[in-house]
Amino acid sequence: MEKSDLEKIAEVIKKHDIFVLSDEIYSELTYLEKHVTIASLPGMWERTIVINGFSKSHAMTGWRLGYACGPRVIIEQMLKIHQFAIMCAPSTSQYAGVEALKNGDEDVAQMREEYNGRRRYLLHRFKEMGLSCFEPFGAFYVFPCISEFGMTSEQFATELLNTEKLAVVPGTAFGCLLYTS
């Protein structure tokens, strides 16, 4: 999301005294502009809880290692729930996370560049095939418009699997309705 959009959202949040839970798991995988966290905007740190982790940025999917940053009073309450409801990440995962934070920046940059190359390739190929596609500015998902095929995204995914042996995830799994039927 662009900084100007975040600033507009922040104004509404401050006006109505709302807290923000900001999922920033893809913050290191943005391609056009550097990620801006809403917590960095004036008056937003004290009303923002940032959720992040290592699964996307450091290719540590399955390690179940993440973190939350925010006002101490909120984080302390989250910790109370977490301590008694959820087991902690294994110590090996925690050590790997520390290593990723200390020495993983170059790896993240290489992955981001690789993902961006794949993104550009897919967008180019979809355009060649005559399929419009929302251009993602981060992460590693693309959502081509399949409306011309007259199928739901589930039907389309099943058809691709059965006829082309290509497995894809239907757009509805991501809440994407515009590009699914």
Regions found by a protein language model. Give the residues of each.
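PLP-dependent class I/II
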Residues: 1-181
